[in-house]
Design a protein with these regions (language model features):
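Long, compositionally biased, glycine/small-hydrophobic-enriched stretches that function as flexible linkers
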Residues: 1-163, 171-176, 181-215, 237-246, ...
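Glycine-rich anion/phosphate-binding loop at the beta-strand->alpha-helix junction
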Residues: 252-255, 264-372
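Surface-exposed charge patches
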Residues: 170, 247, 358, 362
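Structural preference for beta-strand elements that scaffold enzyme active sites
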Residues: 150-158, 179-181, 226-234, 255-258, ...
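Alpha-helix-loop-beta-strand connector modules within alpha/beta enzyme cores
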Residues: 139-146, 194-233, 276-293, 316-326, ...
């Protein structure tokens, strides 16, 4: 790419090295810790789904039970694998019995770690294969229909009712939309559980649930066959359940997910240690599933002046890039965020915005940048 801005690449390299150091320092903490959300994600990746009689998701039931009665720092997988050896049951059956108070997986005789890993291996690999086959299915669609050259047109639906969202999404696809983003209901990022099943009520958006993902994915596949185009599906995994929603998206073949390393800290007041651990595991999953992440730099400019704080956008892009690389997410899957949020009366406003956009394009040449 020919540079149009005559950037000082020594400064670019210096900034990238600083961001890399930030990510490496944080990763020392991340590698030594888990969170309840990460443990619930492990439950989901071992096939646990559904709710108890009080509509509490079974992954929450299992993790909370171990927290209260055992030692969650050993990891939920160890308890589940051990229970499988003791009972001969699958993780889903174990979770259901824990929910009914018919089984206490914290009081069982411990088996050898190697045996526990062996017991878990088959089930873990089956769900990994499901994610791999979803990725292969996406690639198959793109091979048959081809992919769009140039920018994707990104359209948001947010009625609160997944079935009405489907109607709008199908109409948008027929009008040329390439990506359908289903905005989450207000406040879902602060729920410490993922709701279950199809939902028909929401406020400013629709609940992100695995069943809602499945319903929308099916509808977009059907209209895609009609239009001979692959329509991408986007949802949001920022907040308290980042890796859980990333796993659900991987299992239902979502194509894009909002995933910012710092968003929960800066804009949702979520514990920063938890956020950094959660974003890492969620990005590992996104990377493996071939999901393009969209980062949240547009949020900076909704809370600060776009000219005075323009540098914060670039700083965040650098940091998001480095956290993504540590998680194994390739540059081609980093939808680094930007937005046009200047006052319309700003002198030379469009020129300033174009320069900032071109700068992002030159500094992150492989990233599918997100402009809003």
């Amino acid at each position: 790419m020919n540079s149009k801005l005559n950037l000082n690449w020594n400064l670019v390299d210096e900034a990238r090295k600083s961001a890399k150091k930030i990510a490496a320092d944080a990763q020392v903490f991340v590698d030594a810790h888990s969170t309840v959300t990460v443990e619930r994600t492990i439950c989901r990746l071992l096939g646990i789904d559904g709710i108890d009689e009080f509509e509490v998701p079974l992954p929450n039931v299992v993790v909370d039970f171990i927290k209260e009665n055992g030692n969650i720092s050993l990891g939920v997988a160890k308890y589940l694998g051990n229970a499988m050896l003791e009972t001969g049951l699958k993780p889903q059956e174990i979770a259901e019995r824990v929910a009914k108070k018919e089984l206490d997986i914290t009081k069982m005789k411990w088996h050898d770690d190697f045996e526990i890993k062996l017991a878990l291996k088959e089930i873990a690999e089956a769900n990994v294969e499901r994610i791999k086959s979803n990725r292969a299915k996406r690639e198959e669609y793109l091979n048959v229909y081809g992919d769009k050259k140039g920018p994707y047109i990104y359209v948001i639906v947010a009625t609160g009712n997944i079935y009405e969202d489907v109607t709008q999404a199908v109409a948008a696809a027929r009008q040329g939309a390439d990506v359908i983003a289903v905005i989450r209901t207000t406040g879902q990022s602060l729920l410490d559980y993922v709701p279950y099943g199809a939902t028909t009520e929401g406020f400013g958006g629709t609940m992100a649930t695995q069943e809602n993902f499945r319903i929308m994915r099916k509808a977009l596949d059907e209209v895609g066959v009609e239009l001979k185009r692959y329509i991408r599906l986007c949802n949001y995994c920022s907040g308290l359940c980042m890796p859980e929603i990333a796993a659900m998206g991987a299992l239902e073949r979502l194509d894009m997910m909002l995933n910012d390393a710092l968003y929960g800290i800066l804009f949702r007041d979520i514990n920063m240690k938890r956020t950094l651990v959660d974003q890492f595991f969620s990005r590992v999953i996104n990377g493996f599933a071939g999901v393009i992440i969209n980062t949240g730099e547009d949020n900076y400019l909704t809370t600060a002046d776009a000219i005075e704080e323009a540098h914060t956008v670039l700083a965040s892009q650098f940091i998001n890039e480095q956290f993504a690389l540590v998680a194994g997410l390739p540059e081609e899957q980093m939808g680094l965020g930007h937005a046009f949020e200047m006052h319309p009366d700003t002198k030379n406003g469009f020129l300033l915005e174009l320069a900032q956009a071109q700068m992002a394009r030159e500094i992150f040449p492989k990233a599918p940048l997100k402009y809003m």
